[in-house]
Regions:
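Bacterial Sec-dependent N-terminal signal peptides
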Residues: 1-37
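Beta-strand-rich, non-transmembrane domain signature
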Residues: 35-208
């Protein structure tokens, strides 16, 4: 069973963001923040979040993601769960996970076969579904790392959102997002609530 439908919906909503338009390469990343600012009132900390979108054509792309989160207390557990929304155009190709204890020792490897799969609703006529993993570890702090790859085919109308801070009382050490597009293909994006958030945006072409 899924502990929090609200948490799942937040993960799903992140995918509902479209880009189209005018660039070759778009990079976004958080700037360095003092450790005391990161940990202040935090229940969890994103140690590193990395998203790389490789757009092969107007209809095909590969999204490679890596997420490392340290959970500081029980209130931060929701941030440690894994969710990946899929549909007839998006499919989860690769996945691996790892739980690391406070001493830096790997205590568990998580395989793709351990993920749960669920439809959004049996009453809806939709091909949408998602994979999830409910991460639990008895002592705090602990760290969980996920790496996964999603293939998008024949239905590419937008890309994932860049939301470094997904939960309240969550610190962010490092987060990056990069989109690479074929020559002649562009990308349009919109920034929301980035003022004062120490986020940089870089657009480049060719080998820049």
């Amino acid at each position: 069973m899924i502990r929090s439908n609200h948490s799942i919906l937040k993960q799903i909503i992140r995918r509902a963001f479209s880009l189209s338009g005018v660039l070759i390469c778009l990079s976004l990343h958080t700037q360095t923040v003092r450790a005391q600012d990161i940990l202040k009132d935090a229940n969890s900390v994103i140690v590193e979040a990395r998203t790389e979108v490789l757009c092969k054509s107007m209809t095909q792309s590969i999204e490679k993601e890596s997420l490392t989160i340290t959970v500081l207390n029980h209130k931060g557990l929701d941030a440690a769960h894994f969710f990946c929304g899929c549909d007839m155009f998006r499919s989860l190709q690769k996945f691996s996970g790892e739980i690391i204890n406070a001493g830096g020792q790997s205590v568990r490897k998580i395989k793709k076969s351990e993920l749960q799969k669920s439809e959004y609703s049996s009453s809806l006529s939709t091909d949408d579904y998602f994979y999830y993993y409910e991460c639990n570890y008895p002592t705090f702090p602990f760290t969980v790392k996920y790496e996964w790859e999603v293939k998008c085919n024949n239905g590419l109308i937008g890309y994932s959102t860049f939301i470094p801070q997904a939960y309240l009382n969550q610190g962010v050490e490092k987060a990056t997002y990069r989109i690479e597009l074929p020559a002649g293909q562009g990308c349009r994006y919109r920034e929301l609530n980035t003022q004062g958030k120490k986020i940089q945006v870089k657009e480049s072409t060719g080998a820049d």
